[in-house]
């Protein structure tokens, strides 16, 4: 699975969905591997709750999303030989440490990936996500794609931007 955040004080990860798909894919297998950028690591549950106040409101206009799944290690199961699932958390750097050390660029890693900047983008509304991002969409997608994947991948995003700055106001 991915992760919306990983809580350093407990080792738990948080998954936020509306359909419960993340809960399903973490429940079924005997081995759960959660992968996320080092920018997903937050100090405490208080920080996780602050993210939960912002993410659903900006992404879908909800006060709280339908499913918030907390996972802290392997859980008991009858399907595993030793009676317990195993869990592994993998943090990806991919240039994030360098970005974290930059006082201006590090602000991009504070994005919770809610999609609000894409939802207000007139070009995104017309052409959809496949033309507006390699992995990350919207205005923040342009910045993150450039930082993590280079200017060649980000070039198409820049060419699509009409500089209306609706994303900045969102």
Language model: regions and residue ranges:
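The feature marks the mature, well-folded catalytic cores of soluble enzymes
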Residues: 1-103
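Conserved aromatic-histidine-acidic binding/catalytic patches
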Residues: 36, 40, 109, 159
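Catalytic-loop motifs flanking and including active-site residues across diverse enzymes
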Residues: 47, 113, 163
């Amino acid at each position: 699975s991915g992760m919306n955040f990983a809580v350093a004080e407990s080792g738990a990860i948080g998954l936020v969905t509306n359909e419960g798909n993340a809960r399903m894919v973490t429940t079924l297998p005997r081995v759960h591997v959660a992968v996320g950028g080092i920018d997903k690591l937050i100090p405490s549950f208080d920080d996780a709750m602050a993210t939960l106040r912002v993410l659903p409101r900006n992404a879908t206009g909800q006060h709280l999303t339908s499913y918030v799944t907390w996972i802290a290690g392997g859980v008991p199961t009858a399907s595993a030989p030793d009676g317990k699932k195993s869990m592994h958390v993998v943090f990806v750097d991919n240039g994030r440490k360098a970005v974290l050390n930059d006082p201006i660029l590090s602000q991009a890693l504070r994005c919770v990936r809610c999609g609000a900047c894409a939802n207000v983008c007139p070009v995104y509304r017309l052409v959809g996500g496949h033309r507006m991002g390699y992995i990350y969409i919207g205005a923040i997608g342009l910045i993150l794609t450039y930082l993590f994947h280079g200017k060649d991948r980000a070039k198409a995003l820049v060419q699509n931007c009409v500089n209306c700055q609706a994303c900045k106001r969102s």
